[in-house]
Amino acid sequence: MQLSFILTSSVFILLLEFVKASVISNPFKPNGNLKFKRGGGHNVAWDYDNNVIRGVNLGGWFVLEPYMTPSLFEPFQNGNDQSGVPVDEYHWTQTLGKEAASRILQKHWSTWITEQDFKQISNLGLNFVRIPIGYWAFQLLDNDPYVQGQVQYLEKALGWARKNNIRVWIDLHGAPGSQNGFDNSGLRDSYNFQNGDNTQVTLNVLNTIFKKYGGNEYSDVVIGIELLNEPLGPVLNMDKLKQFFLDGYNSLRQTGSVTPVIIHDAFQVFGYWNNFLTVAEGQWNVVVDHHHYQVFSGGELSRNINDHISVACNWGWDAKKESHWNVAGEWSAALTDCAKWLNGVNRGARYEGAYDNAPYIGSCQPMLDISQWSDEHKTDTRRYIEAQLDAFEYTGGWVFWSWKTENAPEWSFQTLTYNGLFPQPVTDRQFPNQCGFH
């Protein structure tokens, strides 16, 4: 009897210790996702359950995009002839050569985003930035034309973020061979990320990022590392992509880091990733990044404003059902695809019927200058922004694309805010509860 009691007590104590240890290292959300991993002196500096991300992307800084900074690409244009204009950063650096490209980019990196931008971002009520960067900032392939030097500015940015109480995702925006063929991957119309050594090189680059920015030195600032921006699921091998995500996750955790791992949804439907990288499989602190745009097909562009808002609201309902934490890591105010070179150099706009066999909807001319927008378009834009904010804040929050552009107002947080179209404060609503969440 006594021996039985001692054994029972011992089992109970062991069970209690196991439960305590599990709770300390694996505090679960009700849906089975992990909130934090505590212990070992580590705390994640962001509570994805209870805090709402309100942020901007620092686009066009370390990865050039022709529509964001056309002034860097227009010198190659000959009148209306765009045939000599590089279509992406790869061809831009290749055309200029390393010396000239480096000189121009050093000036660009030191001026496009400065400490003053971080102060403004904070003063406007934002708490977060997502920083896109290409693999070439960390490792060059043989014969790559890219130039390096981005990392010193990335590290300045992390310091400016810390000083202004802003949290950061470091987002690997371009992989060798390109993961999507978009110009914002560095290399347009290429889909070779999964060929040759490209996936392994990407993992090597991620390992460098993990060791530099995934540890204690930046744990108060970096609240996520995004393994890869917008891998184009429909043209990639999804089994290989999942293995890449798993390898990236394991690589980060093997460094001892508790930093959340961010995976983009690869343009799959809501819920696709629910059973991948789960606590049940021993993976934790995983966030799914969804991007929300409604301008990259003729069908989307032809929607009226009520339809645009309905789609945005449904995003919120669908995202809420997912088992992982999720964030709208990119979105914009765009109701047209009119920004010059948005669809790529030497490509027109669907809105004008000048690209992708899309039907003509209207002229792009007034859309390029916010002072020429009609009152109706301004109202529609404000309504659309507010609906998206409501939808995204129904879950983990939002990261607007982008903080600034040279002359693409639908894509510039600064321009929209200073013209009264983006709410200020960001919680202000002229059109409250459009989605009926409350």
UniProtKB/Swiss-Prot annotation:
It is found in: Secreted, Cell wall. Its EC number is 2.4.1.-, 3.2.1.58. Gene3D superfamilies: Glycosidases. Its main location: secreted. Residues 1-21 form the signal peptide. Changing residue 182 to A: Decreases catalytic activity. Impairs catalytic activity. Induction: Expression is maximal during the early rapid growth phase and increases during biofilm growth. Induced by caspofungin. Transcripts is also regulated by RCK2, SIT4, and HTG4. The keyword Signal applies. Monomer. Interacts with the human antimicrobial peptide LL-37. This is Glucan 1,3-beta-glucosidase.
